[in-house]
Amino acid sequence: MLQWRRRHCCFAKMTWNAKRSLFRTHLIGVLSLVFLFAMFLFFNHHDWLPGRAGFKENPVTYTFRGFRSTKSETNHSSLRNIWKETVPQTLRPQTATNSNNTDLSPQGVTGLENTLSANGSIYNEKGTGHPNSYHFKYIINEPEKCQEKSPFLILLIAAEPGQIEARRAIRQTWGNESLAPGIQITRIFLLGLSIKLNGYLQRAILEESRQYHDIIQQEYLDTYYNLTIKTLMGMNWVATYCPHIPYVMKTDSDMFVNTEYLINKLLKPDLPPRHNYFTGYLMRGYAPNRNKDSKWYMPPDLYPSERYPVFCSGTGYVFSGDLAEKIFKVSLGIRRLHLEDVYVGICLAKLRIDPVPPPNEFVFNHWRVSYSSCKYSHLITSHQFQPSELIKYWNHLQQNKHNACANAAKEKAGRYRHRKLH
């Protein structure tokens, strides 16, 4: 008994061989647990990376949309090839084609061929009807908007019915149709029906329309889940009533848009209009968000593929007028998804049109950029503005636009002198 106590009661008094033996035993146990855990991950990989199947060579980081590959630029060409695959002709139902003989069937886009038979009840719940049809009637329309003048740029602005103050602020600022001398701009607010079924609000919208003639409205419910319908309404309106428009911008009612910079630095009226042109803040390498609690949740039965094609943030993108008809027509053969910007990207992938990057990555911003007249004189979009803020900063920019960066340089020099003195 005394011998056992001398050998085992205290680790500090153990011999070197005993310590080494005990350490080896513990190490083997830990390595065994690590091996078992690794095998568990191997056989249950889908449970640890939602929305992604199989092993991934690239690390992933979580974003607001879902998972994004940190090496997506490297894999962009291969991803584009995946989205350009087609299925054998014998598997396709009768399909429609546009004037360019582009196949408009969803089977032409990898990832959508299996979604046509998915349950469409989610669309009925959102008041949209069949997920592939477009049958909404105009409540308010402006069919002669482009007959009175030949605009260079149409601003399609997604707005909620109750955002009267936001529409008023936009008319006074970046949506002013007389903003650019010698350049015709047309402003159109895109509205659905208020979910509150407010008769007073609808009468106010009708009066607003009679006064400004810049609202189109159709009979779908105006909700976040119907933003895709709202954008398609705008595309169809442009294709129907302004088919020869050089450029279109789709943006939102809470955005700051430097319209002059957009026209003069990006679109350049002195040059011939581009075709099949689409640009904005490029979103590359994004995978569907499979978190059911997320605003951007994408059910696997609606979109089974592992990754979205390249798309532009819906907060603001610009495209050539010829794409309005092409995007709308191709959408008739592609199952509708509630993520509007992703859906437009899918339509572009089906058309074999790649969004192009803007002149620099700082001109389109889907977040709020801290204000300075210098920064805002060299960007196109900034996000999350209240109507009063929009008017305040717009007026300040207009007052300082000819020397927007001069004050910034003076302030920087002053700070440098202050640091040098202290």
Swiss-Prot record:
Gene field: B3GALT2
Membrane topology: Single-pass type II membrane protein
Family: Belongs to the glycosyltransferase 31 family.
Organism: Homo sapiens (Human)
Annotated Pfam families: B3GALT2_N (PF19341), Galactosyl_T (PF01762)
A GO term, aspect molecular function: N-acetyl-beta-D-glucosaminide beta-(1,3)-galactosyltransferase activity
Cofactor(s) required for function per UniProt: Mn(2+)
Protein name: Beta-1,3-galactosyltransferase 2
Membrane-spanning intervals of the chain: 25-45
Tissue: Detected in heart and brain.
Residue ranges, Lumenal side: 46-422
Coiled coil ranges: none
One BP term from GO: protein glycosylation
Reactions mediated catalytically: an N-acetyl-beta-D-glucosaminyl derivative + UDP-alpha-D-galactose = a beta-D-galactosyl-(1->3)-N-acetyl-beta-D-glucosaminyl derivative + UDP + H(+); a beta-D-GlcNAc-(1->3)-beta-D-Gal-(1->4)-beta-D-Glc-(1<->1)-Cer(d18:1(4E)) + UDP-alpha-D-galactose = a beta-D-Gal-(1->3)-beta-D-GlcNAc-(1->3)-beta-D-Gal-(1->4)-beta-D-Glc-(1<->1')-Cer(d18:1(4E)) + UDP + H(+); a neolactoside IV(3)-beta-GlcNAc-nLc4Cer(d18:1(4E)) + UDP-alpha-D-galactose = a neolactoside IV(3)-beta-[Gal-beta-(1->3)-GlcNAc]-nLc4Cer(d18:1(4E)) + UDP + H(+)
